[in-house]
Amino acid sequence: MSKAIVLVAFGSANLDGIKKSIGLLEKDLDSYFGEEYTTFKAFTSNKIIDLLKERYDYVVPHLSKVLFNLVNQGYEEVIIQPLHIMSGRDKNQIEEIVNEYKYSMKKLVISKALFTDEDDKLNKESYEVGNIISENIGNNDILLVGHGSKTSSNKLYDVIEKAVREITHKKVYMATLEGKKTIDTVIESLLRDEVNNLIVKPLFIIPGKHVVSDISTGDGSWIEMLKEKNINVTINENSLLQYEGIRKLYIRNINEVIKK
């Protein structure tokens, strides 16, 4: 019986970032599951799919196209692994697409996102991820950076911030590109707390343009704003998928779905 694992993200037009994040997970899955499962990747943003094709002649198909092809090629078991930091609108979109094919295969299931929205599980997951990303902190306090949302709750970021603070015993702050946790508000807290040395750790699954343009380089970047306040700043530009420990969490999640 032909079996597949499909990694699904909204998408990124950062080709190098794709290769350094999803590409690493693909290699790990091939090593771990390769004898039984073939690994594919898919995006759900047609705009990003078109940009990648136009700029780099690099094709990442839409999830619906991948599933259509797998059905036609006779695949009977498919595990969908969302590459979203948390369940939400993106996962709902994946579920809508998957439901169109659920009667075309013997087994078509969706594995869980990196974080769930159940409080008990979220606390445990935050400590797992917090331990992984808290490596190599040195003599620095910590600024975590997330994408955030203008419309949804940022409870996830509050829980991660608390977990990293308890793990590292450092001053820990959280800023998001969208939402109320702005860099301006964080800078006020940093100055009030007399923070001198800071390491910036992004919480993105795929390193997109945000890490490069908004946070780390150019006029008006977060790093520039922090340095203007005489704060010594180091940035760790790793995406979450560049941590081996995070990739192992995904392998564990997929294993759990396979065994059900």
Protein language model annotation of sequence segments:
Residues M1-K260:
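Extended amphipathic ligand-handling, pore-lining, and cofactor/metal-binding catalytic surfaces
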